[in-house]
Structure formats: C-alpha cells, structure tokens
Amino acid sequence: NIQTLRIVSILENRYYNFNGLNLTFETLDGLIKHNGPVINLTKFNKILGKNFFKNKIKFSNNTSLEAQIAAISDDIAYNSHDLEDGLKSNLFELNELRDIQVLNKIISKHKTRLKKYSIDLIVRQIIRDTINEMVKDVIKTTRKKIKINNIKSLKDVYMSKSQIVSFSDNMKKFDFQIKSFLKEKMYFHENVKVKTNYGRKIIK
C-alpha cells in the first residue's frame, strides 16, 4: 500500500505544478487504510513527509464503505484465484479441499456432475460458488453492522470502532482456513519456492 501511495502521490508526473495524480483525499484515505486504520505513521512520514496530507486524513479512523468493500473484495478474489490456480497447477487436488467444511459442502453439490462435465468446468463452478457464498455473507453481515452501529453518514463510518464491511464470524473462520491451506499447499510448495528464489536472483 505504501508503494502504491508513493506511485500515485510522487512518481506519476502528469501536471506542471505538482507530482502525482491529483487524487481526492477520500481516494487516498482508502489506499492508505486498505488493511484498516494506521497506527504507526513512521513509514508514511518517511516517504511523503509529515505535512503531506495537511491533516485531511485521520489515520486512526476507519475508511469509507467503498474502500472497505474494495479491501474485502481483494481477499475474496485472492482466495478464489489462488484456489483455482493451485488446482490447475496440480499443487493440490480437489479432494484435499474437502477438509474445509464450507468447501466440502460446495464440492459435494457437484459430485454427480463428474461423469458429465470436465474437471476444469466443475472447478470453475466450485470457485464461482465459493465466491458467491463469501459475497452473500459480506452483504448480510454488513447490513447487520450498519443497523447495529446506526450508520447514517460517512462520518459515522469513519468514527466506527470496527470495520463495517466484514465477514461473519463463521466466514472469518472459513477465510482463515483457506489462507492456511493455501499457505501450506501452495505458497510454501517446493516448486513455488524454487521459482520465487529464481525471481529474487533476477531482480537482484
């Protein structure tokens, strides 16, 4: 996020009088708080200077609903794409995903289609169903939080003590299970580590 901020605020050169893309403070706020409120400002101050935002951004506050939606959408996208890529690359098999309860239910729904359709098509549908479950959960949970926290304005969102756009507790467990599975089976897979190390050597 800091590198993205550096690109849009300093490195891009599109105007005579200043560097950056001239983005609104609301957009920059969303970029900065992509992973939630910022407590440690040292890195931001080092790159941009202490007075860059002229007190227009309160780092300890939450960000807008739009920015929170973008952040959680990233999580859903990363999980689903990595599951599909891992299966396509034969880093793990479909049956291994049955250890994750929610995925087991989704996979079971497509069991009868194995003889009729290709495994690639079935995997795509399973991934779509997984995305659908996560998106529906976010919508339902967010609606509840808006009501519980009496959110009526952007200021209410900024001042909220917790993220408004989020998974339910059960879906958070599911999200954690997927990330843990991918970490073990994909990100730390021997073939992936070899290619990662090769990439590091090229960059150096």
Q: Model-flagged regions — what are they?
A:
Residues 2, 7-16, 20-204:
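Histidine-centered, transition-metal-coordinating active-site segments
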